């Protein structure tokens, strides 16, 4: 299918959240306390953060998701709209609460632990997926938060030859179907090893590719960069080096930037470099989205 006449670059299906972020010297032991040196509120969620990266890189993004009608739901909607993301299919669930996360960041390393509640809002169902939006998109990005709805959306995209990038990092019943129907799987290395039962990234990538014969499988490895397998070759990419403040959202930014790179026609080595650059720059600031650069900031680092 030709994609140049489509209106949306990347449509995302999955988490939009509100993040509460505290910085600590170290994590307390059970029963102990640790003072926070900094506390901030930021927009978050896997897909919402990924789409923010798409929008800031100059792409046209849309989200399919459900929020509550609470304070945090209002903040999520306002932020996505402010970022230029199409929220026509961001459903409000009356009387329900939204997805909320608390991120505890280690001051010296930027590493973080995340605690979250999904809220009382309902999940997306297949009937909530607008087929016209899927068909109007150059690429689809999804996590596994909404299960059946995401599988349905992936099926629509698969039938029309639209690339589907998955962001899956924990077990759910829908994972096998999403891996079958998706085209590009970007997986944290620890989950990749767990999912395949292998001991090293290279063997795990091959094992997963043999299961699904996807166009590409990428293992993200934090400050060790990423490695991909396309069924013939390994492609390696170093992490982009910055002074790290907070790694929250870096993987989500990698996913979003990579999905946008597909719509720009980038080959795998170029796209991995693009995603690594933008994800690395994100880590300069607290929060999943605050540090995401705008395209203009990349003028001396990247040529679109």
Description of each model-found segment:
Residues 1-66, 71-78, 82:
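Glycine-rich phosphate/adenosyl-contacting loop at the front of the ribokinase-like
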Residues 88-93, 103-139, 144:
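Conserved phosphate-binding/catalytic loop of the ribokinase/pfkB sugar-kinase fold
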Residues 38, 64-69, 88-98, 169, ...:
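Beta-strand->loop->alpha-helix junctions that form or flank phosphate-binding loops
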Residues 121-130, 148, 166-173:
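Active-site glycine-rich loop that binds ribose-phosphate moieties when present
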Residues 55, 158, 263:
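Gly/Ala-rich phosphate-binding loop of Rossmann-like dinucleotide-binding domains
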Residues 154-236:
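Conserved phosphate/ATP/ADP-binding segment of small-molecule kinases
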Residues 2-8, 35, 201-304:
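Conserved phosphate-binding/catalytic region of the ribokinase-like
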């Amino acid at each position: 299918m030709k994609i140049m006449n489509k209106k949306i670059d990347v449509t995302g299906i999955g988490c939009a959240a509100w993040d509460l972020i505290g910085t600590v010297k170290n994590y307390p032991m059970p029963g102990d306390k640790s003072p926070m040196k900094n506390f901030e509120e930021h927009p978050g969620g896997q897909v919402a953060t990924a789409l923010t990266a798409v929008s800031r890189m100059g792409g046209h993004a849309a989200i399919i998701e459900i929020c509550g009608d609470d304070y945090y739901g209002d903040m999520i909607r306002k932020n996505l709209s402010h970022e230029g993301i199409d929220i026509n299919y961001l459903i409000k669930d009356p009387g329900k609460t939204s997805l909320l996360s608390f991120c505890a960041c280690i001051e010296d390393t930027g590493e973080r632990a995340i605690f979250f509640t999904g809220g009382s809002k309902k999940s997306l169902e297949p009937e909530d997926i607008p087929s016209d939006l899927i068909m109007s998109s150059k690429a689809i990005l999804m996590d596994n938060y909404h299960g059946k709805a995401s599988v349905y959306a992936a099926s629509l995209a698969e039938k029309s030859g639209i690339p589907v990038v998955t962001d899956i990092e924990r077990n759910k019943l829908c994972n096998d179907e999403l891996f079958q129907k998706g085209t590009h799987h970007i997986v944290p290395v620890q989950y990749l090893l767990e999912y395949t039962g292998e001991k090293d990234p290279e063997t795990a990538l091959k094992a997963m590719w043999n299961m699904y014969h996807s166009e590409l499988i990428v293992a993200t490895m934090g400050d060790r960069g990423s490695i991909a397998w396309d069924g013939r070759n390994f492609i390696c990419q170093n992490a982009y080096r910055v002074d790290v403040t907070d790694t929250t959202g870096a993987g989500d930014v990698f996913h979003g930037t990579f999905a946008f790179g597909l719509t720009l026609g980038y080959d795998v080595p170029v796209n991995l470099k693009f995603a690594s650059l933008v994800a690395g720059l994100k880590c300069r600031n607290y929060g999943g989205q605050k540090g995401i650069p705008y395209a203009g900031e990349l003028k001396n680092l990247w040529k679109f």
